Amino acid sequence: MVKPVRVLELITVPADFNGLTRFPMRLIAKMDPSAVRADLLTYAVGDERIRGEIETMGAKLYVAPHRLKHPLSYMRFVASLVRENRYDIVHLHGNSCTLAIDLWAAKRGGARVRIAHSHNTACKFTLLHRLLRPAFNALYTHAYACGDEAGRWLFGRKPFRIIPNAVDAEALAFSEPARADVRAEFGLKDEPVLGHVGNFVPAKNPLFLMEVLNRLPECRLLLAGDGPMRAEVEARAAEMGLSGRVIFAGARGDMPRLYSAMDALLLPSLFEGFPTVALESQCAGLPTILSEAVTRDCALTDFAAFEPLDAERWAARIREGLGQNRAQQSAEGRSAVVQAGHDLTHLAANLQAEYLRLVQADRPQK
């Protein structure tokens, strides 16, 4: 009997209902466990509910010491885990050359296939990013990216393979019953609901949402996510007299239901790789407004639009998009996402085949 390929999906953020965690989770769930057996590793758990989801998939979640606060302990932990579990592949998900820390540990543990996967177009640790680039370039064996811009950011002129972000399109179909249930949960009536999905961090630019809401007195704002800026956003809402119109829903595991309750999705990011949220919102038929910092590749429908960070322009664009036929737009969005190659089942099958090919290859090549 052929043993399954052992894969460690290493994420460089706390395990939570964020895109970087959900990306490998969704793919693992679609793979054949007799062919690929995968686990996840992080340095912190932001929401314990995610642990249950991972274990339900038949995978394990390992929590290492903090990778930047305690790098030596972290590297020893990762190397030991890779060695003990005999992982064939370590697939690292991040956005900077600080991945050199993780790559060194994976190599030390004996992993011959070490995939660096770029999920963004910028990072917080710019000095470390520059200093660690030579080590990073020497340590990865394969380069993946969520899109062209993210690939060029992390790998420069070196070759990389684009692994597109993907979603379960049919699971995101607009649902009138779900819309009614979620609106009842939050005490919403007929008022338009603007939505944002993401962590409360500077890159997501959550304070800009208050400026937009302030120009749309007829609207409510539903924020799904959590993070270090939440208290600051709550304070800004109170300062502007908007607290009664903003719903802080926290991290949620039922996003398809929440999308159905919304009337527009806003992504005013300052930098972004390829936002899975934009794919999800279009599958749900939501008018989707994105900052010009977001890659154009994620706009697959005519109800996704880009605007400069001018609150007046965003407010005008939102008013233009309200009142459309959601069921029809949802059907159009799901079709566009699948046709563009962002279907989760298809991507999981391709990545499973790639994992098997990499392990069978005599020697990994860059």
Predicted segments — roles?
Residues K3-P4, L10-S73, M229, E354:
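N-terminal strand-loop element at the rim of the active site
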Residues N18-R26, P192, H196-R215, P228-E234:
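A conserved mid-protein helix/loop that constitutes part of the nucleotide-sugar donor-binding site
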Residues R108, I115-A145, R152-F155:
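A conserved, positively charged/aromatic
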Residues E149, A166:
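Carbohydrate-associated surface elements
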Residues A173-G187:
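A short helix/loop element that forms part of the nucleotide-sugar donor recognition site in Leloir-type
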Residues A251, L270:
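Aromatic "clamp/platform" in nucleotide-sugar-dependent glycosyltransferases that forms part
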Residues R326-P364:
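A charged, aromatic-enriched C-terminal amphipathic alpha-helix characteristic of glycosyltransferases
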